[in-house]
């Protein structure tokens, strides 16, 4: 093939970029389960504070607080950027390849290898770029020594490097389904447990009182605390804003429940075998045909927009009041924990609390519209290129000697359903997330929606695997056989 | 029936052929590894890696151990920083 | 002018059509029954909490380490 191809950029790296081995055989069910869990737990273990950063509070606060939930990122830890780089890189490169904007011949093994190596290097490169943006902005402290800068760099890039490899371990078939999604699901569920039942005591206020992190524990402890009245404890448990409160906890649970409901809305097409007589079955097409991926895409784009804004305002303009950049782009308002964007950027920033909506009411429209438009656009295109379009499904039907009951041409019927389903599903999810985020969940709403969708996607793979291996699993037996 | 097709039956045949050719072409260059039949991202699952490239091959368990070791090296860095005061 | 109008019409019509189409699709869909839904919620809830508790134990390991060195 003549001409320059983007994937050829990966060629020089092929030789020394680490590559996880594929399993020789299909691994037993239990091994996969254990590896999936262990990998995600190691990811969680990585949420360890960075060394070499200042401990005093700095002027530059967290500008991307509402994007952290979705990407399992924890501020000022090794996982400052979570799994954003691999997810965003993979989604965007795979979309570009699907549009044929990047020339990849997926029929050829060498091309597929180059393509995945390209994803890997670009993600690690993104970690490096993001790390240096944050270092240069003064987020980790002003006037860092050269040594400190080097150490922070190596910590963040090293963590990024291992995160991409952890994802690869699961992706390559040592675990179930997708590494990125397993990590999101487990990290978010841990976050939920921590927010509700976390027992860590954190000092609050000047009087040296301590409050637990978990909202439920806080309620119980509040009733017994001597410095609080019964009513005061109740009010405090529901609306403290410095630590997780019960209101947001309940909202998150409601959102999760709604996603469970949406996940199980489907149309069922009756199919019959063309070989054996009387064999009929149903083929479900889910409303959420592209699952949580549309949201991941919307949030990836949001992340890029906000990082770009942060670079221009903080790095180039220094967030100076009255400078031209701040007049045009609005600049940031520094609060106790966060950097709140002003006018143009605030249109794409969900409020930190329900009442903060009134400061910028337009956000309700722009933020929801952004999520819906990007989500629907993505879902429509993704179903087309990801190998599950109507054409691909009807091809599968033919290969398996299956036909749609009452339709001669399966693809005609499928093309009427699949694109509509994926677009509608993406729009519904976007609306759900917009509602949650506009109520002030600070990224936890979007996080739980993506996490539940991912959990369902993984669960489906797990169930199929469980049935294929004939249910031979000592773990499932231990749990009383209700793992499937 | 024939008269309803402008240009007659033959044009219809041509069009059909062209359509078939187009479809064939579309099928020849798959848009994703899965469309080519090699696994990869599906409609609701994002996969980054499908094939084993000829790189520096590592065992998954080694990676898991190294990842934990990496976190502990950061812990060690904290300890060094605390013991030696302000070194950086 | 006419062309602009047509474009404007299209801009309004596309989302409307989208909503209509989506609504029609939703109406045709099979929704989970109450019993089915309760079962799903229960399973997902238990799974989420179980995995979350395992993850939280890892986080608990962090607390003493942080306390000692930070």
UniProtKB/Swiss-Prot annotation, chain B:
GO terms for cellular component: Sec61 translocon complex. It is a single-pass membrane protein. The chain crosses the membrane at residues 61-81. It is found in: Endoplasmic reticulum membrane. InterPro entries: Sec61-beta/Sbh, SecG/Sec61-beta/Sbh. Keywords: Endoplasmic reticulum, Membrane, Protein transport, Translocation, Transmembrane, Transmembrane helix, Transport. One of its GO terms (biological process) is intracellular protein transport. PANTHER family: SEC61 SUBUNIT BETA. Heterotrimeric complex composed of SEC61, SEB1 and SSS1. Belongs to the SEC61-beta family. Necessary for protein translocation in the endoplasmic reticulum. This is Protein transport protein Sec61 subunit beta. The gene is SBH1.
